[in-house]
Every structure is written in structure tokens, then in C-alpha cells.
Amino acid sequence: MNINDKIGIYPGTFDPITFGHLDIIKRACKLVDKLIIGVAENVNKHTAFDTKLRTSMAENEIKGLGIDADVISFNGLLVKFAKEQNASVIIRGLRAVSDFDYEFQMSWVNYKLLPEIETIFLPASEDTQFISSSFVKEIARLGEDVSKFVSKGVQNELINLNRIKNGE
């Protein structure tokens, strides 16, 4: 790692990590010298999986794909985390216009807090543009196959989660 290397942060809740997230991660790696996947510990957002497991799932997914990136959990302001990691860019994926509205507002706030950190938006690929962690969890909760949206390892975690919730 060189002192002049461009470090990017791809933040998210990753509850769970999906093929859509992995698509953005693969593409983001081409844009920066080092990518950090920031697993957000968001106290205002109820997650199905705890931060440790979400971080572990992300680590397993990128390792399985041979992606050279770090996975680090964080809480608090994203721009503060980015600054702590010496990142110069935040990378966000966009699925639909509704994502853009929210993400554009957040990028403005982040810019006001730390103007030296830029935000890059990557549109979702056509085959992943409508995958969301919420949809995946609901489909899995109903006992349906989610293999088109997440890896086998994540599927197994969803099955375990639903067994626990159902008292099995």
C-alpha cells in the first residue's frame, strides 16, 4: 500500500450481503487502489443479523470471489469512518430513482461535513438492480428459494435465522 493510493469505502448494512452488493464491490475495486467494505452498525435500523455475523458473511463472500478488500465494521458518521481509514471516496450503489434521491441528499450532507471526501454513485447492473436485502429476507422467511439473490453461505444463514425465529 502506497501513501498516495486512492482508498474507497463501500458502506452498507449488508443485512444480508447480496449479489447486488457483490456486483458493486467487484466494480468498485477497479476504481480504487484499496477498497474497504464498511459494515454499518446502525442503532436506528433493526437488523436481522448482528454486526459480527454481517461482517463475517461479507468477509466470506469477498474471500470466496478472490476480491482483495478489507471488511471493517463501524458505527457513527460514515465520513468520520472514511477519514479514519484515510479514504478519499465513498462508493454507493444505486438501484432506482428512489435510491438516488436519498443517496444524493446523504452525499450533500457528507460533503458539507468533509468536502475532501467525494461520493461516487455506481448504478446497479441490469441483473441485480432490484435485489434488496429486505426482499431477500422476506422471501427466505416465507421458505422460498433465494439462490438467485445470495450465495449458498448466506442462504444457510437465512435458514438458520428463520429456524431460530420459528423456535426450531
UniProtKB/Swiss-Prot annotation:
CDD domains: PPAT. Keywords: ATP-binding, Coenzyme A biosynthesis, Cytoplasm, Magnesium, Nucleotide-binding, Nucleotidyltransferase, Transferase. The keyword Phosphoprotein does not apply. The keyword Heme does not apply. It is found in: Cytoplasm. It catalyses: (R)-4'-phosphopantetheine + ATP + H(+) = 3'-dephospho-CoA + diphosphate. Belongs to the bacterial CoaD family. Homohexamer. HAMAP family: PPAT_bact. This is Phosphopantetheine adenylyltransferase. The lineage of its organism: Bacteria, Pseudomonadati, Pseudomonadota, Alphaproteobacteria, Rickettsiales. The gene is coaD.
